[in-house]
């Protein structure tokens, strides 16, 4: 274009009705020859648009064909061989999606419905297998924690000992009330009356040979008490023993450090040691802290002496 002069007019490509090209120059115009032609731009005659790339040009000359799509061949029906209509070997067409493929986002479509990760819950079978295969380390940690703190069992045993002392005082008050009522009834009855008629409420106590032991009584008092027994005191001691057993069972259930048999044996040993220490401390401080009349042991021993004072010494010796 630069070689052309400034006054030169560009040539225009003309296409006739029959499709032939014709060049119209200024000389032809001057000559007066006018043809009935139609002016068509060059780019409109191209089949691929206004600008044709190199790739399109190469592709138009090369014999390229699209890749063949994967096709799944259906197996012949196996109804002749088996009762079911399902094929013997499953194909990929039967698989909707693979649960193990987490990063295969290229294969997902909008209609794909698969469970999300945060909504997935393990089945009960998986939970059972996991609990059976994997050891439960949490229980072992709790057991070790209980072993590191033996003071918890000592505190519980001290609480049990305090409850036992409260029960002993209540037993002493009950026995004292029963003895007072029996003394009022025995004053109006003559001494010559038969023993069974004078004390009908305590008849079964003479026939029974069961003996009871109270922890705060000394060895001398135990010898005196073992010779005689009372139905009310036996019942109270039985209830006391049941309550102690229930407390011991609760402590064994709460403690996870040892098995049932070992924990029960250890707890009984701890209770025995604490009981001995408490007895020594109680007997050392008994004269300073407690009055003789308010002491449960003294009350029970005094009531027993008054209760069996009407017995004949010969019958007591024979028993």
From Swiss-Prot:
Record keyword Mitochondrion present: yes
Pfam families in the record: Mito_fiss_reg
Keywords: Membrane, Mitochondrion, Mitochondrion outer membrane
Coiled coil: none
Membrane disposition: Peripheral membrane protein
Cellular component terms per the entry's GO annotation: mitochondrial outer membrane
Annotated compartments: Mitochondrion outer membrane
Major localization listed first in the record, in broad terms: mitochondrion
Annotated stretches, region: Disordered: 1-35
Keyword Nucleotide-binding: no
Family from the record: Belongs to the MTFR1 family.
Database matches in PANTHER family: MITOCHONDRIAL FISSION REGULATOR 1-LIKE, PROTEIN OF UNKNOWN FUNCTION DUF729
Function, in words: Mitochondrial protein required for adaptation of miochondrial dynamics to metabolic changes. Regulates mitochondrial morphology at steady state and mediates AMPK-dependent stress-induced mitochondrial fragmentation via the control of OPA1 levels.
Protein name according to UniProt: Mitochondrial fission regulator 1-like
Natural source organism: Xenopus tropicalis
Taxonomy of the source species: Eukaryota, Metazoa, Chordata, Craniata, Vertebrata
